[in-house]
Amino acid sequence: MGPLIMDIVYYDVTRLLARHSAPTPTGIDRVDIRYAYHYLSKNFEKKFIYQKDATFYCLPSKTAKLLIELLYSKWITNNIESECDQKLSAIYKNTIGNKNSNISKPSFFQAITSKFTPGQYKAVDGSLMDLLSHYRDKNGYYVNTSHHGVGHADAYYVFKTLGKLKIIFYLHDIIPIDFPEYVRIGDDKNHTTRVAAMANFSDAILVNSNYTKERFISFCHENSFRVPPIHIAYIGVEDSFIKLLNETRQEKHDNLKKGISISQDY
């Protein structure tokens, strides 16, 4: 896959908000925060959006930047700043932790939005609809790398019709489908819904290995789903893990030399 021409990206940070209190990241968290941090530094327009009670909202730019930088420091670099958890908690309480749901109405493109079903109209907050309208002639992408909240068909319809967005998902695995005995009851059905939505709505799927790619293709064929373009985006190793490995090797080497020296003394 060649470089994409991206004028604007709508990156889904719902999982990052939901996982804000986790002291350490899971594998999916690591991918999610890396992509979010990467987009934060890019020159093109980016909006960080989240899902709450089946509705998509847009995070204020400063809030999104603070969320991503705090989690990146906490999970990746371990440079945890003072009051990190308190700040993350405050962001959470003002977003998906907020019990009040105030969905605003869109101001533009009434000719399109007036044709939405009640479910589609509720799926995207009016202020986000206005952003989709404003940038609809740009090369826009909705990106979700976390599995979190995937399957929101009404919202995807709005994204594609109002915003003319292309949709990209990252599929990490289909373990809950292949091995339901190893997951919580119901997780296999939930993941089937997610993967089906990826097949039906995505313009491109990112996977972490050729095996995941092959299993996704098989899943699509078995269920008579379309097979969208699939691209392997291999996952690297965190610098901190490499550093720890090198330190461990050095320590073993030093201990071995010390042991040899002691034995020679005897």
State each model region's role:
Residues 1-266:
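Carbohydrate transferase catalytic cores enriched for Leloir-type hexosyltransferases
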